[in-house]
């Protein structure tokens, strides 16, 4: 924990760790020497069985071989898109691109043709690496349709066809010099509020952020981390993959999030750490109650992407007898901004998102004047430091709007900071509810509702109203099979907050529409309501 004495909602970068001037490829080469025979990667296949594995020496060898292949086919700085689930080839391509000076563009394997085409076209990708199908999605057919007329895309490669994946091209096969400030990836924002933008992330941003994360999550060379977060997101290919790399520990890569399979692998492979959004953790607990497993090896569970209910934290700590932390960030910051410490209290874990990461300045600023606000005052969370994206790809206007002239990246998230430097998130600027001229912050209302025993997950949104402009509405996923009681929840809210913040419309849902990173798509809930899909209780 940092023992800080700020005078306002501003924490300057803490120098308890250094920013290393290093590329992803540099790290792989370092660790392959230091931990040559240690297991780096273990595959878990679709059926939940373990498959192929690599030592760090083998991982470097295959990555360098693939890098030479890519260098013979593409020029340094060109962009290639990976459109695949969590398969080992994904990681090989990530490392090979880093070694070859290529920019990796990530795409969600659930995309349909228009979504895929947007990413390919907006990024200017010259190649598409994919699996032919995944979970019923005919990806090869979709790719053919998506690339019609896209002259920039020179080839479509099936990553399961290693002859095609590793083939040599016509160019000289020489690996170039790559610099820490060079672009490593273009990650498309998950779009909780609209169309995605491509955040260009540098090698030094991704590598240092992942190291800071893994260190605060107590990773060691003896750790074994489960990775069931999507590789197309910075959590999967950044925090976990590059975090494990820098500690030379073992990563178990799950092709599919299957709670029962994950619990079996936790037992058989002695998993010590994992990261999951709250929905995933709930599913693991539900599966564990049906089919018990020995999960005593787990030392750390980390969650992010949404506020965590106190009951969920207690249940995880009881079931796994482990430490629990939450993290907060966004794609544009590579991705982490704050993280808890292992010794933090359950109150801090549930009411805040922790303290800033090392070498990261964080401030809470007024939206109107861009000035730092007093403690415990809602404003926009802003970030300054090594972790900030280079730009939004081919979008100068959005880049200028996101990063001001002083280098502060404006996250679009509303939050507060207390006198210890702990940050709380109260919602998105664009999700703030304005009822009769008064600002309502969804996260504040959600946190109150998460304390109710019948509430498993919740999303509070503003819905249009002729009288008030907007009214507060609440979508609930129940903790039991029983229907929720709106009157009971209304009473709970009135006992814990002002009456105008209490939802006036209640909806029960079986599942929430989620982004690829597990965040609730609140604008979609609003749109579905307006189209008549939801009826209030």
Task: Report each predicted region and the residues it spans.
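Conserved pre-ATP/AMP-binding loop-to-beta segment of ANL
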Residues: 21, 36-39, 170-188, 195, ...
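Conserved AMP-binding/adenylate-forming core of the ANL superfamily
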Residues: 37-95, 112-117, 164, 177, ...
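Conserved AMP-binding A3 loop
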Residues: 52-57, 184-208
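AMP-binding/adenylate-forming catalytic core of the ANL superfamily
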Residues: 68, 111-117, 121, 128-130, ...
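Structural core segment of the AMP-binding/adenylate-forming
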Residues: 102-166, 480-482
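Conserved AMP-binding/adenylation subdomain of ANL enzymes
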Residues: 207-224, 232-273, 283-287
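Gly/Ser/Thr-rich phosphate-binding loop
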Residues: 271-276, 285-348, 361, 370
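Conserved ATP/PPi-binding loop(s) of AMP-dependent carboxylate-activating enzymes
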Residues: 355-359, 371-402, 440
């Amino acid at each position: 924990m940092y023992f800080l004495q700020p005078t306002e909602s501003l924490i300057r970068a803490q120098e308890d760790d250094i920013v290393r001037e290093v590329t992803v490829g540099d790290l792989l080469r370092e660790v392959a020497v230091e931990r040559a025979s240690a297991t780096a990667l273990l595959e878990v296949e679709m059926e939940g069985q373990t498959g192929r594995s690599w030592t760090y020496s083998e991982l470097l060898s295959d990555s360098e071989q693939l890098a030479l292949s890519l260098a013979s086919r593409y020029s340094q700085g060109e962009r290639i898109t990976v459109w695949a689930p969590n398969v080992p080839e994904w990681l090989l391509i990530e490392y090979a691109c880093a070694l070859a000076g290529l920019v990796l563009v990530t795409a969600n394997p659930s995309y349909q043709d228009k979504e895929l085409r947007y990413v390919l076209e907006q990024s200017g990708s010259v190649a598409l690496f994919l699996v032919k199908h995944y979970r019923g999605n005919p990806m090869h057919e979709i790719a053919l349709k998506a690339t019609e007329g896209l002259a920039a895309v020179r080839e479509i490669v099936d990553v399961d066809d290693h002859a095609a994946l590793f083939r040599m091209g016509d160019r000289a096969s020489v690996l170039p010099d790559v610099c820490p400030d060079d672009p490593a990836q273009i990650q498309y924002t998950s779009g909780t509020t609209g169309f995605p933008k491509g955040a260009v992330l540098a090698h030094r941003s991704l590598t240092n952020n992942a190291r800071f994360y893994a260190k605060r999550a107590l990773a060691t060379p003896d750790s074994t981390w489960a990775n069931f977060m999507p590789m197309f997101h910075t959590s999967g290919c950044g925090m976990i993959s590059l975090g494990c790399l820098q500690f030379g520990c073992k990563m178990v890569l799950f092709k599919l999030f299957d709670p029962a399979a994950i619990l079996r692998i936790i037992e058989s492979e002695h998993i010590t750490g994992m990261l999951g959004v709250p929905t995933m953790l709930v599913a693991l607990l539900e599966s564990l109650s049906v089919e018990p497993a020995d999960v005593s090896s787990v030392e750390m569970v980390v969650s992010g992407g949404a506020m965590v209910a106190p009951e969920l934290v207690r249940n995880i700590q009881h079931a796994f007898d482990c430490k629990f932390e939450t993290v907060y960030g966004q794609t544009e910051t590579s991705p982490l901004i704050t993280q808890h410490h292992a010794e933090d209290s359950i109150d801090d874990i549930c009411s805040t998102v922790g303290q800033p990461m090392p070498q990261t300045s964080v401030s809470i600023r007024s939206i109107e004047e861009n000035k730092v606000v007093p403690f415990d005052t809602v404003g926009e969370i802003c970030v300054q430091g090594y972790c900030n994206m280079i730009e939004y790809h081919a979008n100068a206007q959005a880049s200028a709007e996101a990063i001001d002239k002083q280098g502060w990246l404006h996250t679009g998230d509303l939050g507060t900071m207390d006198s210890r430097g702990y940050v709380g998130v109260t919602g998105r600027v664009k999700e703030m509810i304005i009822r009769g001229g008064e600002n309502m912050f969804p996260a504040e209302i959600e946190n109150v509702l998460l304390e109710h025993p019948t509430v498993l997950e919740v999303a509070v949104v503003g819905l249009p109203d002729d009288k008030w402009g907007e009214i507060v509405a609440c979508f609930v996923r129940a903790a039991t099979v029983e229907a929720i009681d709106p009157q009971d929840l209304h009473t709970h809210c009135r006992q814990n907050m002002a009456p105008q913040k209490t939802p006036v419309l209640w909806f029960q849902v079986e599942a929430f529409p989620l982004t690829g990173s597990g965040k609730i798509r609140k604008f979609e809930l609003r749109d579905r309501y307006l189209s008549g899909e939801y009826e209030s209780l």
